């Protein structure tokens, strides 16, 4: 592998139901054994307010090939949620110099089938061009949120992204005027 670490070998903090670190494990082992870890979800919008939507590549370790309305990923061992949000947004969007994503809320994702992670949701405005990683993104576009809503019943989306999106919509409703949106 030319000295490069695969995503399955990345070291993650393993956390408990209160998001306290209780150990570390390789990413591949964390997924295989259903170990709770940390992830970030970044709601990326352009200056017109359109949402960055993309289709994941078929080679992704988790949820290969569906669409997602967030960029993001796992939080590395010892990494903060805030640092991971910026790193993942810049990596997946292929855009450097982004403003630091704004933290919105955090929730525990659990699909009931062994996939569980603490999920921090952020928002970032993307003013410049994007050039997503071809290893991560098979297709992308900025869609008006109304179009995204229409695609929810047509396209297959990642389940954790759908969960984060439902919570984002509820959070915006609870936050009132001036909230994200």
UniProtKB/Swiss-Prot annotation:
UniProt short sequence motif Nudix box, positions renumbered to this chain: 72-94
Leading EC class: hydrolase
InterPro entries, per the entry: NUDIX_hydrolase-like_dom_sf, NUDIX_hydrolase_CS, NUDIX_hydrolase_dom, NUDIX_hydrolase_YfcD_pred
Highest rank taxon of the organism: Bacteria
EC number: 3.6.-.-
PROSITE patterns the UniProt entry points to: NUDIX (PS51462), NUDIX_BOX (PS00893)
UniProt similarity note: Belongs to the Nudix hydrolase family.
Entry protein name: Uncharacterized Nudix hydrolase SCO1686
Organism whose genome encodes this protein: Streptomyces coelicolor (strain ATCC BAA-471 / A3(2) / M145)
